[in-house]
Amino acid sequence: MPELPEVETVRRGLTQQTLQRVCTGGEVLLSRTIATPTPELFLVALQQTQIQEWRRRGKYLLADLSREGEPAGTWGVHLRMTGQFFWTEPATPLTKHTRVRLRFEGDRELRFIDIRSFGQMWWVPPDRPVESVITGLSKLGPEPFAPEFTARYLRDRLRRSQRPIKTALLDQSLVAGIGNIYADESLFRTGIHPTTPSDRLTKIQAEKLREAIVEVLTASIGAGGTTFSDFRDLTGVNGNYGGQAWVYGRKDQPCRTCGTPIQKLKLAGRSSHFCPRCQPCS
């Protein structure tokens, strides 16, 4: 699933290509991609709207829309497992997994391609709070780059639970946007074993973990995200962070720090990669 850096990369691409452009029409090819309203009303709602801003909240993308200078609601998107946008010309042949296509002025088209078909879109009327329609937004914790995401906040939240620290980091109510890749990478940088109970984290470890999370996410955003399977930017280019990964996706390969083979284990149904020497189990 695309995580914060991948979604931020997409947001930047959407901003570059579609900001201030007017949507002139479109087609929904898979109705369940549109969570609300109906596919027909969704297309009507976006018709002749201009995109004023693309925002990101956790793994959600939010476009503020206007029509003739007046607010026209919010277009929300969650890529889920394999969703991706492709900016192209209308004459470009459709791929098998194209779910939504939207035409824009300037003879351009934005296509939503989703192999697994879990991605979702919403349109929120201008008189409704966005969180009342896209309810997952109300459950998100702070952004990793937000001032409120401090070491103290992190430790206070973690000390209430005995669940493994890796599992805790995947909880979007703790911090928004972190997934499997960057949880593994952050724990490695901090020297914390993924099975460490959350309530055992020391003050110093919490400080180092917060710093590692910010550093890892910043590095990945700078590299355009990570591509291990389906992620691409709007032009079809892979993310470049994968080649820099310390542990994720490197099972049995030597640790870049000490040479010990990277190990992999399952936690709550999710794979975790770690170095048994750099991240000893306490």
Swiss-Prot record:
Its cofactor is Zn(2+). Binds 1 zinc ion per subunit. It comes from the Bacteria. CDD domains: EcFpg-like_N. Keywords: DNA damage, DNA repair, DNA-binding, Glycosidase, Hydrolase, Lyase, Metal-binding, Multifunctional enzyme, Zinc, Zinc-finger. SMART domains: Fapy_DNA_glyco, H2TH. A zinc finger (FPG-type) spans 246-280. InterPro entries: DNA_glyclase/AP_lyase_DNA-bd, DNA_glyclase_Znf_dom_DNA_BS, Formamido-pyr_DNA_Glyclase, FPG_cat, MutM-like_N-ter, Ribosomal_uS13-like_H2TH, Znf_DNA_glyclase/AP_lyase, Znf_FPG/IleRS. Involved in base excision repair of DNA damaged by oxidation or by mutagenic agents. Acts as a DNA glycosylase that recognizes and removes damaged bases. Has a preference for oxidized purines, such as 7,8-dihydro-8-oxoguanine (8-oxoG). Has AP (apurinic/apyrimidinic) lyase activity and introduces nicks in the DNA strand. Cleaves the DNA backbone by beta-delta elimination to generate a single-strand break at the site of the removed base with both 3'- and 5'-phosphates. This is Formamidopyrimidine-DNA glycosylase. It comes from Synechococcus sp. (strain ATCC 27144 / PCC 6301 / SAUG 1402/1).
